[in-house]
């Protein structure tokens, strides 16, 4: 598996392996265990900005990814900052406990807006692909500022995301889930266990969240989606609600925990 273990710092569209990809990539395995830092924009643990077709690839991030972007084109993700391309038959994982040469690495994502455990902003078509986030996501908001679109998997989504079964249809081969903890310190909006902001035409199916969300100063906080604009134009169907507990305490007035949903968010 090819990979990056060095620290990478730049202004915007900073990637641990690739900054800008406009070409098709097929049959590649890659990882990042280094620190990827964008000082005035978005970052991706592996790819900062992708417009190409990705097929049959495995990408794993176990490094620290930090972005500072707040505009609509700046996305920060554990694997990809901003994805506009199609992704098929692949695995994208932001993980913890990743071992290389007896050394253990943990993926962490920090940012301001359009932050996702796997992808910051997605406008592409993703199918028969695993999107898995096991790492923590932390957003620290300065006073008088507002963070928006924070998701366990995707910060802002206008594309389609679909898992899938194996050829025998006996089990879900491609997993879509988040079990990392999302923490937003300060004012925020559109905070979701899977997607922060699912815009019109955005969809996700066959996914679930088990991660806790701590966002006491935020609005539009959901176990699956923080803000679903596709609902107003189309509909939202929950296939299976396993458990949802909303805890309100004086210390943490808006904390979602112990959430495990299998849901379909669709725009048809």
Where are these regions (language model features)?
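Surface-exposed loop/turn motifs in large extracellular/passenger domains
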Residues: 1-268
């Amino acid at each position: 598996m090819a990979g990056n273990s060095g620290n990478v710092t730049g202004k915007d569209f900073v990637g641990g392996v690739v900054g800008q990809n406009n070409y098709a990539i097929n049959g590649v395995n890659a990882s990042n265990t280094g620190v990827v830092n964008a000082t005035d924009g978005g970052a991706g643990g592996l790819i900062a900005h992708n417009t190409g077709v990705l097929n049959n690839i495995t990408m794993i991030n176990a490094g620290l990814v930090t972005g500072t972007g707040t505009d609509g084109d700046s996305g920060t993700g554990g694997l990809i900052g901003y994805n506009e391309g199609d992704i098929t038959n692949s695995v994208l994982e932001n993980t913890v406990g990743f071992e290389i040469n007896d050394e253990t690495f943990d993926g962490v994502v920090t940012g301001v807006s359009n932050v996702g455990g796997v992808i910051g902003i997605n406008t592409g078509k993703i199918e028969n692909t695993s999107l898995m986030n096991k790492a923590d996501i932390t957003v620290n908001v300065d006073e008088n500022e507002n963070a928006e679109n924070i998701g366990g998997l995707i910060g802002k989504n206008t594309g389609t995301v679909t898992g899938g079964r194996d050829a025998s249809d006996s089990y879900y081969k491609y997993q879509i889930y988040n079990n990392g903890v999302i923490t937003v310190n300060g004012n925020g909006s559109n905070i979701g266990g899977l997607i922060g902001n699912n815009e019109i035409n955005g969809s996700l199916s066959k996914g679930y969240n088990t991660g806790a969300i701590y966002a006491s100063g935020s609005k539009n906080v959901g176990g699956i989606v923080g803000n679903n604009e596709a609902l107003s134009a189309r509909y939202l169907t929950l296939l299976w609600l396993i458990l949802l507990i909303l805890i309100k305490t004086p210390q943490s007035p808006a904390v979602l925990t112990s959430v495990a949903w299998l849901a379909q968010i669709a725009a048809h």
